């Protein structure tokens, strides 16, 4: 059952990532990997909220919710591999400031998003 839930969650998360990324690129252009950055920040925020909510607020078989939402949906939604290749492409194109900014913003804002998510999750 867990494998099926992870499969379904990953599919939904991947579709959500595709939609959010494309919307951000449509609105803001592709000069900077803003789509991946927004996806990873919102994914980190949701991870914090759902982690606390599932562990502290739900009763019953929390492993099913963890499989569907944390491992599945958020695993399919967020992407370290896209962050990595987009940063590499910035470096290869000589956009060193953009590459450094992408690394700094991704790390700092994703950690901040997870922290904020935990705080929000504890208030639910």
UniProtKB/Swiss-Prot annotation:
Q: Which HAMAP family match?
A: FluC
- Residues that hold Na(+) according to the record: 75, 78
Q: Which UniProt keywords apply?
A: Cell inner membrane, Cell membrane, Ion channel, Ion transport, Membrane, Metal-binding, Sodium, Transmembrane, Transmembrane helix, Transport
Functional description taken from the UniProt entry: Fluoride-specific ion channel. Important for reducing fluoride concentration in the cell, thus reducing its toxicity.
Q: Where does this one sit in the cell? A: Cell inner membrane
Which family does this protein fall into? Answer: Belongs to the fluoride channel Fluc/FEX (TC 1.A.43) family.
Sequence intervals crossing the membrane: 3-23, 34-54, 68-88, 100-120
Q: How does it sit in the membrane?
A: Multi-pass membrane protein
Modes of activity regulation:
Na(+) is not transported, but it plays an essential structural role and its presence is essential for fluoride channel function.
InterPro entries the UniProt entry points to? FluC
GO BP, one annotated term: cellular detoxification of fluoride
What's the name of the protein?
Answer: Fluoride-specific ion channel FluC
